[in-house]
A protein has these predicted regions:
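Accessory, non-ATPase domains that flank or precede helicase/AAA+ motor cores in DNA-metabolism machines
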Residues: 1-315
Length: 315
């Protein structure tokens, strides 16, 4: 399968035009399909018929049409997800060539989020209601106090249970009386905005010098590699966070790639202290629902920082 194709973000294809689709199936070539009535763009995620099945693919380039066009089938569905960026298409191609991995295998790595063919889903959340409680108990009081103190927030059942240290039956009882409102909310919501201007730990002169160099490299907007040498506990992480902060100041996204064993609560709390909120996460301990949210928010540029294990490289 040749991937020597120049990708341009302006390519779009109207109803019936031929497009070449890369699927995740073990097929060593692109497959030609006709664009659906609503059209598709370069990088559109689509669902296409392949034999009796429907499989996920990406519109990779214009179709070749080098066989009987009467046998070419039409794309079944254009998925309601952001298009793959030309930079990502080029990245997958380059990594595939470097690692001798077929391009369909690379696409499989980039589409590991579950439920990509599903429409945006909803979840049940809880907020303060307008009703009165007929009988107050300590458990009910804790729930209502939390909702009153955080009136601008919504909680899932699990979050509210843990915050108030109550059972779900306590929450449901308050819902039945209208004191707590049970609402539907989009499941794939953006992550809280991070603040790169929050003060960092006091850096030594050597750390500050290294951090300044990293920030300068980020501002140059070109690829570069920087290796920090230092013993454990010497503050290398704080220096790398200076580079992350510069990315955020420039409106860019950042990926912090670390071994899964290092993905600890303490490390995430450290990032929260530096930027005001916890970042998105991608690793084996993350639920499938949260992985779908992370994948979508990264694609929509609504996840500023992702902390992840190796597989997060292909988000």
């Amino acid at each position: 399968m040749s991937d020597q194709i120049k990708h341009t973000s302006s390519q779009n294809f109207s109803d019936g035009e031929l497009v070449s689709v890369l699927t995740t199936q073990p097929i060593d070539r692109f497959l030609d399909y006709k664009a659906p009535k609503e059209g598709v763009n370069l990088g559109s995620y689509v669902e296409v018929p392949l034999g009796p099945r429907k499989v996920i693919g990406v519109v990779w380039c214009a179709g070749k049409g080098d066989y009987d066009q009467n046998k070419i089938r039409t794309i079944s569905n254009r998925l309601d997800v952001p298009e793959m960026r030309p930079e990502m298409m080029e990245f997958l191609s380059r990594v595939g060539r470097y690692t001798l991995t077929p391009l369909n295998g690379m696409l499989k790595l980039a589409t590991r989020a579950p439920g990509l063919t599903d429409p945006p889903s909803m979840k049940i959340v809880y907020a303060k209601g307008d009703g009165d409680v007929d009988r107050m108990t300590p458990a009910r009081e804790r729930v209502l106090k939390i909702l009153k103190d955080t009136a601008d927030m919504q909680f899932t059942g699990k979050e509210l249970k843990e915050a108030a240290n109550v059972t779900i039956s306590v929450i449901k009882g308050l819902v039945s009386q209208g004191a707590v409102a049970e609402l539907e909310s989009p499941r794939d919501i953006p992550y809280a905005e991070l603040d790169p201007c929050l003060p960092s730990k006091k850096l030594t002169s050597a750390q500050k010098d290294a951090g300044d160099r990293l920030r300068k490299n980020i501002r140059m907007n070109t690829y570069n590699t920087t290796l920090l040498r230092g013993i454990t506990g010497s503050g290398k992480t704080e220096v790398y966070l200076e580079a992350v902060a510069e990315c955020l100041l420039l409106g860019k996204q950042a990926l912090i790639l670390i071994p899964e064993i290092a993905l600890t609560v303490e490390f995430l709390d450290r990032l929260k202290k530096r930027f005001g909120q916890k970042p998105a996460q991608w690793h084996s301990g993350v639920t499938m629902t949260e992985k779908r949210r992370c994948w979508r928010m990264v694609a929509e540029a609504k996840a500023q920082v992702v902390v992840g294990a190796r597989s997060s490289l292909y988000l």
